[in-house]
């Protein structure tokens, strides 16, 4: 797909999603971002200097709000969808929004189905951001990190597995990005890539401890938005340093 794309963002107020949004905007693409508090993004991307960003206030579990983000200016479905939804951990190591990803995916797929029923056409490529430590085909993280994923990140992983399973079974076009433990700060470190087919198994392996949120978002923009590389379509992609 060439030319200017319209890309919908969910969970782009911070972290990986924010980085992907920044680089997509900088490339001149039209972006629509759903956020509960639009002022978080207008503080970073002022309306006067970012005419290619449309903000929609709402919740990712509301079909009506999500639907508003999925319609491009031509009246058809957007070209791509980037979802980096996730729940913060509370003081007891629980999730502040249990099932946030699973509910978010259910809502997204329901919104797409309703819009198509209403006559809109298109097959957006859906990119979701997850974590290593949840492969069905063996260990995809350093051995020392296995206890961390099994305890501290157990509930978020359970939620993301449900979400990703729904996406894989949906028949939509997708790429699932599994980042190793996320750090802060843009770097020039080499990014290593592993590819896994969610139904057929692992094609290549990359095991590492961490990668920054900024670098992950930039990689998503470069390889899945600015140029959608076919080798990543219908695949799980591990990104790590």
Provide a role label for each language-model segment.
Residues 6, 79-80, 125:
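Structural motif
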Residues 92-189:
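Glycine-/Pro-rich loop/turn segments that contact NAD(P) or position catalytic residues
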Residues 2-30:
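N-terminal Rossmann NAD(P)H-binding glycine-rich loop of SDR-like oxidoreductase domains
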Residues 16-21, 108, 163, 220:
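Hydrophobic residues within alpha-helices
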Residues 193-211:
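A conserved pocket-lining segment of Rossmann-fold NAD(P)-dependent short-chain dehydrogenase/reductase
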């Amino acid at each position: 797909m060439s030319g200017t794309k319209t890309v919908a963002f969910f969970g782009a107020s911070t972290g990986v999603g924010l980085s992907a949004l920044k680089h997509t905007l900088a490339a001149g693409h039209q972006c629509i971002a759903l956020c509960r508090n639009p002022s978080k993004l207008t503080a970073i991307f002022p309306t006067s200097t970012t005419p290619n960003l449309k903000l929609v206030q709402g919740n990712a579990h509301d079909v009506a709000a999500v639907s508003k983000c999925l319609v491009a200016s031509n009246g058809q479905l957007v070209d791509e969808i980037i979802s980096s939804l996730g729940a913060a951990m509370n003081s007891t190591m629980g999730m502040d929004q249990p099932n946030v990803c699973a509910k978010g995916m259910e809502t997204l797929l329901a919104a797409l189905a309703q819009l198509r029923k209403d006559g809109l056409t298109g097959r957006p490529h859906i990119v979701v951001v997850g974590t290593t430590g949840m492969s069905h085909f063996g260990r995809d993280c350093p051995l020392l990190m296995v206890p961390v994923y099994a305890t501290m990140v157990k509930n978020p992983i359970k939620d993301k597995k449900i979400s990703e399973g729904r996406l894989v079974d949906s028949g939509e076009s997708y790429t699932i990005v599994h980042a190793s433990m996320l750090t802060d700060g843009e770097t020039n470190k080499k990014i290593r890539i592993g590819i896994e087919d969610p139904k057929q198994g692992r094609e290549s392996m990359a095991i590492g401890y961490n990668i920054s949120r900024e670098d992950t978002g930039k990689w998503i923009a470069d390889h899945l938005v600015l140029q959608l590389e076919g080798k990543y379509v219908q695949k799980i992609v591990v990104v790590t340093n």
